[in-house]
Amino acid sequence: MLGRISAIRKATIGLALCATAAVGLAACGTSSTTASGPSCPNTTSLSGAGSTFINPLMSKWSEQYVDAHCGAQVSYQSVGSGAGITQFLQQTVDFGATDSPMTDAQIAQSKAGAVLHIPATIGGVAISYNVPEVAASTHLQFTGDTLAKIFLGQIKNWNDPAIAASNTGVNLPNQPITVVHRSDGSGTTGILTHYLAAVSTAWSSGPGAGTTINWPTGVGAKGNDGVATQVKNTKYAIGYNELAYVIANNISYGAVQNKDASGFIVPSSDTVAAAANSVTDIPADLRFFFVNAPGANSYPIAGFTWMLVYQNQTDADKGQAIANFAWWATHSGQQYASPNYVSLPANIVAKDEAQIKSMKCGSSACYKG
C-alpha cells in the first residue's frame, strides 16, 4: 500500500456504518462489495481533506474499515494541512486533518462553533536526502544546529565541516546542497519548523515556525509525495518527509541528534513512540507539539495528525458517522499504525474519547457507543 503513495493523492474511503437509530454504527461483518446490501439500507456520505502526512495510513484504514462496517461512504482529499484547514473552515468538507494544530486566529474564523482537535496518529518527519556517494545503508547524522544552517542556506556544500564533524569516515562530496521544501501549507513543515525553532535561535528569530514560512533557500514541491519525488530525482538534494514516504520511495534519510546530545536517532516507530511517551503535560484542547522530546531514544522531529471536527453537528446522521469513524480510528484503527506510524498512547486515547463524547447532535450525544 505504501508503494502507492503517489497514486493516492485523493483517497476514497469506503466507510461503513450499519444505520440503526439506537446504536449509531454497528458492525455488519460484510465485505466492501456488500457494504450497501439489504442489511444496510441507509447511506451517509462524508468528506474530509487535509494532511498528506496521514494519507498512507488513511488509505489503510479505508481498506480495513469497509470490510467490517457498512452504510456510509467517506472521501478524503490528501491536499495538505493548510488546504484542509481552509476547506474545513469553509465547511466544504465534514472533517479536516492537520499535522499542525489550528491557531487561535484560525479557530476564531469558525462559523460553525467550537472546533475539536482529535489526535489520530503519530509519525516522524524524516530528513530525506540524495547523495549518491553515501551508501544506502548509511544514515547521515545531523545535529539540530547543522539542519537549521542547511535550511537557512548557510551551509551550502555536502562536505561542509559541520556535516563532516558528525559523520566521521563518510565520503561527503564537494557538491552544492539543493534544499527542497513544501510549496503548500503543510503540517509536516509545521513540525519541522517548530523543531528548528526549538534548537536554533537563528531559526526562531528568522523564518520561525508555521505551516507556511518564507524559506531562505531552496525549491518548493507540493505535498509529501512531491517533496519525496523532487529529492529522489535531484542529486545532492535534502528535504523532509513523513517516514512512510521515504521508505515507500527508497529514499535515504538521516539520524538526528537527540535532545541531550547523547546520540543520533534514526526515525522509526520505536523512536517516535519513545518521543510520544515522554509527553506528560497535555493541554485540555490537545493542541501542542512535542518536538525535541527528552529521552535517550526519542526521535526529535515527531508529531500528531489531528482530525478536526465541529463540536456541535447540525446534521445528526453525519455527526454520528463522523463520531463513530473518529472513535474507530482512535481505537481499532490504531492496530494498523505500524510500521511507519505509532499507536496513540493510552493517555491520549482517553482524551480523544472525551473529545468525541462531547460532540453534540442537537440535544443528544453524537457518539452512541
Predicted regions and their residues:
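Sec-dependent N-terminal signal peptides
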Residues: R9-A19
